[in-house]
A protein has these predicted regions:
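C-terminal catalytic domains of large/alpha subunits in multi-subunit enzymes
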Residues: 1-104
Length: 104
């Protein structure tokens, strides 16, 4: 879910004085259960040859792929209109702006 949040929701916005507009989680957009797709987790064991017991970190793996996959899917859908979104998060406002810029 962290990667989906990065791709579609999470953004630090600041006012003209440089103060954050969202200073609590009540104001900061994060995906919740209503926005969560069904996720099926598969495990594949690939021990690291560089550590004593083959262990590796796991925290980053779920956050790295989703923004790229979602971005590619959105841009694939926009391709026929000559539009592209190249900034995260991918919001409806940014998609509409990309379509307008492309003259679609």
């Amino acid at each position: 879910m962290q990667g989906i949040g990065t791709a579609l929701y999470e953004e630090m916005a600041f006012d003209e004085r440089g103060q954050p507009l969202a200073s609590t989680f009540a104001d900061y957009l994060l995906p919740g259960t209503a926005e969560s797709p069904d996720i099926r987790v598969l495990h594949m064991e690939t021990p690291s040859p560089y550590t004593r017991f083959g262990q590796k970190g796991i925290g980053e793996s779920g956050a790295i792929g989703p923004p790229a996959a979602i971005g590619n899917a959105v841009n694939d859908a926009l391709k026929e209109f000559g539009a592209e979104v190249a900034q995260l998060p991918i919001t409806p406002r940014r998609i509409v702006a990309a379509l307008e810029e492309a003259g679609a």
